From Swiss-Prot:
GO terms for molecular function: ubiquitin protein ligase activity; ubiquitin-protein transferase activity; zinc ion binding. It comes from the Eukaryota. Interacts with POB3 and SPT16. This is RING finger protein PSH1. The lineage of its organism: Eukaryota, Fungi, Dikarya, Ascomycota, Saccharomycotina.
């Protein structure tokens, strides 16, 4: 089975063999200078560049972290020589050697020069201009809440201070990875059991930090919410945050106190508003009760009166009743739907007139000596609603109580 590809390749046509060979030669070309990699160097992320191009790339980015030119991943370890690609290119050049071709001679000269440069730098221990010798890493100190420190002098690194120059403030060493960043958590690198242990460890560390800085940590509602949020939070933290996490938790605790004070003030304002509205509504009910009692007193006084109507007045009333009946009939004929009739309107109008008469009688001064004539003067608006006919004045003779005196 180990020689399966060998046998298949031998039986392929020339076109297939040429395509495979062309792809192999393409993998020997540097993506920066687009020339053959006589000294191919492989970065930790797996990309390959020639030694000269990668050396120039590191030298031109002295104020930034060392990163891959293609994927921008941090290069924390020195790139290694890719001997496999180097052997491929050397074998192809050996088979295609042509001493009479000037271009081929130039190609071999370039190959020899680059290989010698690499050998000399390696012997002198000056690979990549000593950039990896003179630089340091930002590492997390697990024994001190994961605080980021310089790998050379172990000085604490503040991301705000090293953000611009990316240099250790103590030993002035170049930090070749981002001091304030956090490695991306790759769940595929761990088994399910290991992932559970990591989640539990992170949850306990988060709870301990929260309990040490939050004054509400002992409350059940806060602790339960923290547990829920910690379980649902994505697995993005690979190292603890150190003192920055503690300062962040302190700010969360202060915000929680301010929010609780604001809620208490809102509740007090709502209670005061409800109390004011309640007093206002109760005053209206008291006024309505007072008006109703006054109206009942007036109506009861009117009920105790006896009204005596003279003959002339009876004749006038009969004539008026006849006219009202005619008017009611005409009114009902024009309303075939039967929803409203003149009789019902008269009864409603009589009730309105009676209440208004009671109100008018309350305002008058009721003083009688013997018998007196009382005129019922209705409002102009009431008469317009009742009947468009001219106003009529009715005379009444009122007897108070059971007295025979007029």
């Amino acid at each position: 089975m180990g020689d399966e590809l060998h046998n298949r390749l031998l039986h392929q046509n020339d076109g297939t063999k040429d395509a495979i060979l062309y792809k192999i030669i393409e993998s020997l070309v540097c993506s920066i200078c687009h020339d053959y990699m006589f000294v191919p160097m492989m970065t930790p992320c797996g990309h390959n560049y020639c030694y000269g191009c990668l050396n120039t790339w590191f030298a031109s980015n002295t104020q930034k972290e060392l990163a891959c030119p293609q994927c921008r991943s941090d290069i924390t370890t020195i790139p290694a020589l890719n001997t496999t690609l180097q052997q491929y290119l050397s074998f192809i050049l050996e088979k295609l050697r042509d001493q009479n071709d000037e271009s081929f001679k130039k190609l071999l000269t370039t190959k020899t020069k680059e290989e010698n440069d690499y050998k000399n730098d390696k012997e002198k221990d000056t690979l990549f201009d000593k950039v990896f010798k003179n630089s340091a890493l930002a590492v997390a100190d697990d024994s001190d809440d994961g605080i980021t420190r310089c790998s050379n002098c172990h000085w604490e690194l503040d991301p705000d201070e090293v953000e611009d120059g990316n240099v250790c403030p103590h030993c002035n060493a170049r930090i070749r990875n981002y001091a304030g960043g956090r490695d991306e958590f790759d769940e595929e690198e761990y088994s399910e059991g290991e992932l559970d242990e990591i989640r539990e460890s992170m949850r306990r560390r988060r709870e301990n930090r929260f309990a040490s800085t939050n004054p509400f940590a002992n409350r059940d509602d806060v602790s339960s919410e923290d547990d829920d949020s910690s379980e649902e939070e994505p697995m993005r933290e690979h190292i603890p945050l150190g003192r920055w996490a503690r300062s962040h938790n302190r700010s969360i605790a202060v915000d929680a106190v301010d929010d609780e004070d604001d809620e208490e003030e809102d509740e007090e304002e709502e209670e005061e508003m409800d109390s004011d509205l309640k007093d206002f509504i109760e005053d209206d009910e008291d006024d309505e009760d007072e008006d109703g009692s006054r109206r009942n007193l007036v109506l009861s006084a009117l009920k105790n009166r006896h009204v005596i109507i003279t003959d002339d007045e009876e004749e006038e009333q009969r004539r008026h009743a006849t006219e009202e009946e005619d008017r009611d009939s005409d009114f009902y004929e024009h309303n075939d739907d039967g929803f409203v009739s003149g009789d019902s309107l008269d009864e409603d109008q009589k009730e309105v007139t009676r209440i208004q008469s009671s109100s008018d009688s309350e305002d008058r001064s009721l003083s009688y000596s013997g018998s007196s004539d009382v005129k019922d003067n209705n409002d102009d608006n009431t008469e317009e609603l009742d009947d468009p006919q001219p106003k009529r004045q009715k005379r009444f003779r009122v007897v108070l109580g059971d007295s025979d005196d007029e």
